[in-house]
């Protein structure tokens, strides 16, 4: 689990910077070449936060006069912020809603990942689920509160919950369970609750260094064909690399596999935003795989 971000995901400096108005310009350097300078702000999905940090670090190395501030608070917050002109770019882990498009939101696909069902590694139900897989019907019953398991969902408006709900044919507000803020919060709750089951973005379900499931958490396999058993071609959860390959090949269902987006309010005019988006969708794609994401 990406513990290094927990202390900084809620409070960032993006609003402080945005209050002064975002700046960006292209100027001439001492050698006569064009130099990009200024700063931009991003807010939104926990799912994209770790990858966005890597993109920002490399972009800053390429353009030392550019600063990028990033904060995570859920896809819903990102959309709200960008449409209110509080940030330049929203990180969004779901499809845009019609009303968001009507307000001028423009989405740029930048990566692909998935939401997975997660469970306490010592949950008594886990052994059976390894044999049968979790069918859509079973998952629906769990998040309707019809089982004895302790069910967790998200309390914040987020792409992960909307994506998992879409897999069940529902909306986020239909999901029953204990609401917890953020991906790290759900993962920590499951680690402490032997009877717990929930869902996470894959970046928090797996350890980013070992690519194995996060300590104390297990990944619940999906019975994709609904035949009541986990077939050989449905077994791809042991490592993050196996799951990423399954997502890329379409073996893991969509939803809960999904595209991830950077979103702007209308066509961006800030040259730093324009160049950053170009970078992310071209050279920046090489960082997707090592970070646990599928490139577009």
Residue ranges and their predicted role:
Residues 1-5:
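Positively charged n-region of N-terminal signal peptides that target proteins for export
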